[in-house]
């Protein structure tokens, strides 16, 4: 359930939350076109995914594989012993899947689908010169003023997320980049920054550039007089590579990355890729991550289609901890190619001409478009929210994220919230306390100096009436006396970020 969180107080009776990836054509990979539930979709031509029915059947299943000349390449013990099975030479994927599904010891089998990549005021030069419009838009380069995240206002509240690990499951990262190296997560065993599912090793070097760009948007080193500023200063970036130099990869390798992230303390996983074909194996892996409180951020896709009508996975998966993000422009419109969905997409975030770190060199930067970039902005925002509220549940944080939008007419029928992410609203929730004076309720609001807040009252927690909007003074605190409170014993009050 998507709920709204607010700072509440009750009067006593006396007073009282892209470049994208899609299933499709792949370069340099062995492919098979599979006919069936995923008709026309590309899959690995020599590999399938098989789920054993129970522990007792695994030995019999292994014998069945051997008898057909197949080999189990990989097993995921924490995902019900899901198997990655290498087929016999010349064996077709469709036939192998169909045959496995007839075995009494198999719960289900599916192809190994292909995914493809899509494409404080810090002193960082590209922030200061206005190139990073997504963080601070004052109308530069044809934009509309304030069609941004309100990042500087959010950073007034919290700017760093040094306790939070964000896993980027993508094409890897250029680990030596001047704006990224300091913020990379390091494995306590060997000091490496993550995992490479393509090699099985721990060197997730980016040969494509997609992952490096996402990394900079999420958590480029800020205030270092270089390059760009990330949304979450000092967040730790865990790099999990499953896409190759052409931006192509397989479900099995994505699952390996998810399992690595889950096993090594990731708080947030960025999923800037997707497909039109449902994978039960991938869904189970994401559900397992969610069950441990990990927040999942998925790009809505770049097909200019309605995800309510044509689902796009993993963004369309019905997971409580998953937020689906569409791409907005510098004028607060939907980016032409961004997917949308009144019920299946949660919110918009900047995804056009997003400037960030590039994999071409240690001081390289570039601009990219897509819901991938939009998702990265949300991952950074969630890192700051998790840092700020370590005791909050994942459901509470995502409810707050979904509430923290600027409502815009362009998004009213395009996503669940009808708005674009506002970082300041996600972070700037004031404390509220109640007192009394001469028989009337006094509401004390403690926020950030110079920020505006709205105090509202309700008798039923459903219908709220705004009492006053005020800008917090230098000490951040102000007091409101409700002269009407004597007529409403049991009245509730709340304070929220103002306009």
Regions found by a protein language model. Name each.
Residues 50, 85, 100, 106-109, ...:
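Residue-level detector of buried hydrophobic side-chain packing
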Residues 22-34:
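Bacterial N-terminal signal peptides
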Residues 38-123, 131, 153, 162, ...:
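Inhibitory N-terminal propeptides of secreted protease zymogens
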Residues 239, 256-285, 292-294, 321-324, ...:
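C-terminal subdomain of the subtilisin-like protease fold in secreted/lumenal serine endopeptidases
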Residues 428-499:
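Short, composition-biased motifs enriched in small/polar/acidic residues
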Residues 122-238, 242-249, 253-268, 287, ...:
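Active-site core segment of subtilase-fold serine proteases
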Residues 294, 312-387, 391:
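Extracellular S/T/G-rich loop segment that most often corresponds to the catalytic His/Ser-adjacent loop
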């Amino acid at each position: 359930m998507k709920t709204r969180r607010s700072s509440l107080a009750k009067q006593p009776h006396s007073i009282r939350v892209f470049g994208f990836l899609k299933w499709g054509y792949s370069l340099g990979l062995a492919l098979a076109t599979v006919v069936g539930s995923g008709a026309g979709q590309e899959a690995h031509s020599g590999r399938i995914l098989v789920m054993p029915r129970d522990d007792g059947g695994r030995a019999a299943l292994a014998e069945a594989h051997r008898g057909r000349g197949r080999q189990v390449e990989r097993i995921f013990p924490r995902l019900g012993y899901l198997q990655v099975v290498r087929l016999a030479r010349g064996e077709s994927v469709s036939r192998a899947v169909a045959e496995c599904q007839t075995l009494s010891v198999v719960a289900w089998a599916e192809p190994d689908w292909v995914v493809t990549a899509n494409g404080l005021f810090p002193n960082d030069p590209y922030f200061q010169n206005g190139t990073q419009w997504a963080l601070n838009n004052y109308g530069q380069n044809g934009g509309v003023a304030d069609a941004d995240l309100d990042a500087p206002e959010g950073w007034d509240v919290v700017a760093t997320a040094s306790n939070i690990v964000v896993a980027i499951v993508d094409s890897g990262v250029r680990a030596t980049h001047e704006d990224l190296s300091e913020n990379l997560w390091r494995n306590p065993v060997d000091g490496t920054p993550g995992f490479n599912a393509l090699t099985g090793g721990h060197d997730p070097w980016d040969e494509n550039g997609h992952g490096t760009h996402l990394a900079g948007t999420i958590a480029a080193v800020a205030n270092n007089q270089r390059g760009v500023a990330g949304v979450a200063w000092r967040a730790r970036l865990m790099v999990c590579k499953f896409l190759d130099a052409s931006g192509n990869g397989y479900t099995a390798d994505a699952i390996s990355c998810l399992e690595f992230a889950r096993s090594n303390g990731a708080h947030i996983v960025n999923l800037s890729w997707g497909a039109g074909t449902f994978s039960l194996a991938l869904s189970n892996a994401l559900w397992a991550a969610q069950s441990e409180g990990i927040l999942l951020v998925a790009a809505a896709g770049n097909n200019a289609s309605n995800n309510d009508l044509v689902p796009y996975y993993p963004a369309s998966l019905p997971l409580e901890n998953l937020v689906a993000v569409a791409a907005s422009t510098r004028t607060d419109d939907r980016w032409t190619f961004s997917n949308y969905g009144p019920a299946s997409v949660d919110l918009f975030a900047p995804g056009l001409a997003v400037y960030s770190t590039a994999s071409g060199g240690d001081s390289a930067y570039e601009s990219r478009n897509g819901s991938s970039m939009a998702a990265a902005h949300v991952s950074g925002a969630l890192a700051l929210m998790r840092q700020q509220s370590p005791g909050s549940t994942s459901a509470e944080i995502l409810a707050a994220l979904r509430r923290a939008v600027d409502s815009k007419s362009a998004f009213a029928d395009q996503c669940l919230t009808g708005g674009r992410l506002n970082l300041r609203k996600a972070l700037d929730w004031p404390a509220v306390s109640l007192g009394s004076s001469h028989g009337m309720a006094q509401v004390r609001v403690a926020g950030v100096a110079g920020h505006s807040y709205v105090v509202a009252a309700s008798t039923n927690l459903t219908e709220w009436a705004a009492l006053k909007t005020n800008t917090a003074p230098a000490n951040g605190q102000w007091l409101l006396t409700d002269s009407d409170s004597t007529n409403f014993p049991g009245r509730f009050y709340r304070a929220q970020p103002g306009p």
